[in-house]
From Swiss-Prot:
Binds 23S rRNA and is also seen to make contacts with the A and possibly P site tRNAs. It comes from the Bacteria. Keywords: Ribonucleoprotein, Ribosomal protein, RNA-binding, rRNA-binding, tRNA-binding. GO terms for cellular component: cytosolic large ribosomal subunit. PROSITE patterns: RIBOSOMAL_L16_1 (PS00586), RIBOSOMAL_L16_2 (PS00701). One of its GO terms (biological process) is translation. The gene is rplP. It comes from Buchnera aphidicola subsp. Cinara cedri (strain Cc). This is Large ribosomal subunit protein uL16.
Amino acid sequence: MLQPKRFKFRKMHKGKNRGLSCDNKVNFGSYGLKSIERGRLTARQIEAARRTMSRSVKRQGKIWIRVFPDKPITQKPLEVRMGKGKGNVEYWVALIQPGKILYEIDGISEEECRFAFKLASSKLPIKTIFVSKLVL
């Protein structure tokens, strides 16, 4: 699973997920999967989508993951009374704003890429669209 190797503080405030994403252009590959909704992706969801894409692409193309889960989500155990401090870190999430590029692919045809991204988007809890790199 994806998670930071080192971090300054183990636990974080919940915070807000406002604004639009700056990572809205395809940088590395030819095609990208772009979010059009706000939400959170867990490390498991990111990995599940990556696996489905890599199975679909096989060994032809190259896949880039443009999101990283760097926010810890804590949870208290079941049937524990309130108080006594914040719970333990249960999993890690990446906060997603509209317009963020989640994955990129290069080295395969557009039809294969669309099919791979369709499979990957079914594993994700947010709505996404297919985008291609603008070549001028």
